[in-house]
Amino acid sequence: MKAIILLFDSLNKNYLPPYGDLLTKAPNFQRLAAHAATFDNSYVGSMPCMPARRELHTGRYNFLHREWGPLEPFDDSMPELLKKAGIYTHLISDHLHYWEDGGGNYHNRYSSWDVVRGQEGDHWKASVGEPPIPEVLRVPQKQTGGGVSGLWRHDWANREYIQQEADFPQTKVFDAGCDFIHKNHAEDNWLLQVETFDPHEPFYTTEEYLSLYDDEWQGPHYDWPRGKVSESEEAIAHIRCRYRALVSMCDRNLGRILDLMDEHDLWRDTMLIVGTDHGFLLGEHGWWAKNQMPYYNEVANNPLFIWDPRSAVCGARRQSLVQMIDWAPTLLDYFQQPILADMQGQPLAKIIASDEPVREGALFGVFSGHVNVTDGRYVYMRAAQPGREHDIANYTLMPIKMNARYDVDELGKLSLAPPFNFTKGLQVLRIPAREKYKGVNSFGHLLFDLRDDPQQQHPIHDEAIEARMINLLIRLMKENDAPAEQYRRLGLDVV
């Protein structure tokens, strides 16, 4: 048995032909959908990048207990479990967060790994002097970082070395993935995880892909949107063209993997999972990107395609709710390994085969933001009560953040907390925290009916439906052994 994961970043399903888009040129995603089950209700869990990857390893939510950070000593790791069972696991990635403080122990769980440098503001190429930066329409406010450490500055330093398609990190990632398949296709018992940061912003690609779209933009350079939309309609259209161009580049590289699946008849004995960690807002709801606003479906409901050689389902749509916490149990089940007790996800074999549901509801969110729940029809977003936005704490035995250590003042306020039901009997550090994305809770509670309002333009007010969704939310939070202050923060009465 073999398996391949292709993991993209910030892939918005509304820009893919299998999900109804008529503008993006992505024939290989169409080709994939014809040879796999396509999921219409695949939701995020813990947001964004590394919290999602922690779910990929552990098969359980983590955003209620801690912000972005490393795997914990008590975390189960699917790639490591497979490795210990004699199944070779290999990671290929250009996802720069793996070599930041808060991601530095994920890749070590694989049998081997290959990293490609240069995406976004990866601190890759040195430039003591100022790199050449053209006039731009708008500098991404949250990305500048200040001084020589800022993502903005480093991204432009890197771009000097990324000019031809062969130079791009995405290309190099898929080169390495193809090399692995060429070398190992006849071997048995392996998992290959190929992941690229694209089509994450900045939307930088070659003219070959940009020329596929009728972009009439005549203004200054602009490929890195952020925050609230303040640009003209022309600028919004320009960004969407650049995003589509980058998706087309992703599509070409997806096709390279599909070609090798055909060439070596890997469809016979190889599971293929193609998905993303989260989506991306491209001006919808008046926002760019993610995190600073409610998790609308453009970010939360993501593309997912799975080929399972056991059921050999091709060209079918699946409506049942699934999440990234299901990927680890699905792969463990596929390789005939036990699914551990602390994993909350479910193996997806039955959904793939016959759309048999595995859950009533899906929990999702980001640490300190809304706690969201969906049953497939309704989405309920529960915000912190006014004045309680900062009533939250990190629970961890790895006191490291995304790209920084905890400072002395923060650690001076820590206390020792009793074990949770997933910490293997270990006590954990409780470190008081604050609302991470300023103002995210100010949107208040939101309830959407996806059947009548799939674009989530008109929140509804229905006490009976809200009460039912609150009960579902509380049940899922209890199953996750959520900290007591989460209920207080959200104004939930729990017996």
Region roles according to the model:
Residues H57, V229-A237, G255-D259, E263, ...:
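Substrate-binding rim/cap in mid-to-C-terminal beta-strand-loop elements of soluble/periplasmic
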Residues M1-A37, S46, K83, F443, ...:
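Active-site-proximal N-terminal segment of extracellular/periplasmic enzymes that hydrolyze or transfer
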Residues G102-W152, V194-E234, P303, G387-R430:
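Core domains of carbohydrate- and sulfate-ester-processing enzymes
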